[in-house]
Amino acid sequence: GHIWFYGALASNEWDYPWMDEGIYSYYEQLYMAKARKSDPASQSSRLSNQLEKILGQSLNEDSLMNLLFDVACFDHNDQPIHTKSEEFTSFNYGVIAYMKTARAMGFLYDYLGEELATKCMHNYYNEWKFRHPQPADIQSSFEKTSSMDLDWFFKDLLSTNNPLRICITATEIDKQIKIERKKGPKTPLE
């Protein structure tokens, strides 16, 4: 799948690994989640079972990704998604180019909704297959299809390694919940 996705869109994997490795990894994770449900003996299910034996607790794919992110962020070694391949540390290339981007794509899909996000990706693919798209091209395609400004994702979230910090407060008197961004990328709080 990784070779097909890269070959069909022909994005520059060296300058923008997230446009190849990360986006495809998002779809791969969706597929693997469905495969695990339909086949408990799958390779990823066996890996989860082995990790559970070693760690003494169950680790689903999200928990494993969170653990790897924690390792990448330890001592401030995290890097932005929008980093050239040669500038990643060897550990971060795998964690960030593949996994962190997949997580970010999941965030974008949740924000847009599955139907609209899928339509955006189909239109991007049809418009840019075999044409060597750049980051501005995928952003333009998604914005044109969704009729939304997605700078918060393509220009802010992908270009920073600042963690998102949100403060949630609730008041019992007027039964209000307040959600406030304290730090990090200017992502929607919907």
Predicted regions and their residues:
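Hydrophobic alpha-helical and helix-loop surface patches within well-folded domains
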Residues: 1-188
